[in-house]
């Protein structure tokens, strides 16, 4: 009887130990995540959100934009204030009067990679008016710029990267957005390789033993010069120069000056909202490369061309 009692006691003890072990493991597993949430709190959630947004980006989706007001086309074209007619000399000894008779159409001009899309975003936030483009970028069309390919006076400004008489013809005035060529060329290379907010992989710079990148820099530096000088010097309408660095440093002041140039009365409430949401999703985040993609010869060529163009535009304090 005594032996049998000890056996029953042993079995009961084993069962108790087994059940106790299960309960202990369950308690630990439940406590683990709770402690992690308690220690990290919002940070842990933020990391999850970052991963989720990044994954959506890989799938070609962007987080939804929040506009300060509903976007719309201009109800009526903005017209140039009545001014005395200008005397234009069509050939030696012959003058004609030029009247301001047509609605304004403003071009938003830049070399690619200079922040054109970001400035369009800021203008749409600050006015609620759609901006147009001579292009039809389906990515932009679906994510905040429904007036892609609209190039008439129903929009606030029209994006273009073109230059020359045919490109100037439709416009009465132009906003010329200028960015340092070294950064603009790099941004354009990233755009062609990774989209509006993506990046080129390091191996892209080494493609064809670097010859592709070398030729890209040479071609784009020439295009950067032509875009900026042709509009600044040869376009016959009014031109407002906007340097990208000034826009970054003083978003409010730059937006105010642009709206004044466009003869558009500033809405203080919308402007304040635009400044709160100034980053948006169309500005490429900074990324530090582990190498300098520009060779010494490239740097020298860029420095020389930058100095020439900036001097022609009256900018002497850059770089």
Curated annotation (Swiss-Prot):
This is WSCD family member AGAP003962. Belongs to the WSCD family. It is found in: Membrane. The keyword Membrane applies. The chain crosses the membrane at residues 8-28. GO terms for cellular component: membrane. Glycans are attached at residues 152, 228, 234. One of its GO terms (molecular function) is sulfotransferase activity. It comes from Anopheles gambiae (African malaria mosquito). It is a single-pass membrane protein. It comes from the Eukaryota. SUPFAM superfamilies: P-loop containing nucleoside triphosphate hydrolases. Keywords: Glycoprotein, Membrane, Transmembrane, Transmembrane helix. The keyword Transport does not apply. The lineage of its organism: Eukaryota, Metazoa, Ecdysozoa, Arthropoda, Hexapoda.
